[in-house]
């Protein structure tokens, strides 16, 4: 992002232990100058300064600012994980992205799943389960 507050940020996140505490409360964000366009597209229904960060040039309009210094990139990670869960399978792998978003993750997931040489199903049977994983589907798609 060209905005000085958002800019390029990096964060490594490992979900292997099922712990989302470092990203779960990160909010979506937008630039103030994009609000009319976003609303015009029928998006941001219910959006407010309580559930979204609004950035106006070099100022965050939310009274309390960011919840943490990594909130922008943490929300991008949270979005990516949520989009990947739409596959209906737990995916084991490594993802690296730059300015990711829903459309990019959707394209990645579609292309990945279309080519069966990219993945295979693996059963969790006989493997130690983490209690936090109980809400994930049983079959697992893995990188081949």
Where are these regions (language model features)?
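Short acidic-hydrophobic catalytic motif
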Residues: 1-144
């Amino acid at each position: 992002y060209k905005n000085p507050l958002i800019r390029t940020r990096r964060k490594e996140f490992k979900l292997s232990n099922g712990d989302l505490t470092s990203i779960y409360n990160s909010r979506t964000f937008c630039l103030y100058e994009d609000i009319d366009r976003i609303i015009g597209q029928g998006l941001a229904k219910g959006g407010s300064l309580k559930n979204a960060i609004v950035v106006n040039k070099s100022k965050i309009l939310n009274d309390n600012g960011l919840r943490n210094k990594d909130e922008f990139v943490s929300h991008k990670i949270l979005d990516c994980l949520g989009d990947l869960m739409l596959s209906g399978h737990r995916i084991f792998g490594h993802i690296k992205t730059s300015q990711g978003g829903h459309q990019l993750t959707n394209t990645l997931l579609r292309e990945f799943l279309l080519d069966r040489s990219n993945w295979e199903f693996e059963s969790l049977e006989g493997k130690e389960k983490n209690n936090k994983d109980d809400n994930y589907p049983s079959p697992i798609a893995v990188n081949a």
